């Protein structure tokens, strides 16, 4: 395989789609909306230090998140093509859930090509950017 020359447009379209499905009111709707983006066995996620593997493990994590209202502002989306046709995506932004204060966040994705000519999330890391004072 080779580098995907359309990596930036793919990354931006993916992020718009992902957050439109993630930023819904309940965990079950969130999991249902995102299920097609994960591979049954070959997807990995670290969410605030907690790891999950495979579609079912990741979607289970999404159903247990305690918030119902999400407001998100994306500051920047950076992306790079990887040698095997994958795309690395990094998102920086701000996030407000329920009545919690606004917090900065970072999220990284590795989008892997699948056999249908599109992508699945191979790897994902999410962190609120909280610093000890």
Swiss-Prot record:
Record keyword Glycosyltransferase present: no
Domain of life of the native organism: Eukaryota
Main location group: cytoplasm
Alphabetized Pfam families for the sequence: NTF2 (PF02136)
One BP term from GO: protein import into nucleus
Coiled coil: none
Function: Facilitates protein transport into the nucleus. Could be part of a multicomponent system of cytosolic factors that assemble at the pore complex during nuclear import.
Keywords: Cytoplasm, Protein transport, Transport
Entry protein name: Probable nuclear transport factor 2
Keyword rRNA-binding appears in the UniProt entry: no
Span of domain NTF2: 10-128
GO molecular function: nuclear import signal receptor activity
Cellular component per GO, a single term: cytoplasm
Compartment(s) of residence: Cytoplasm
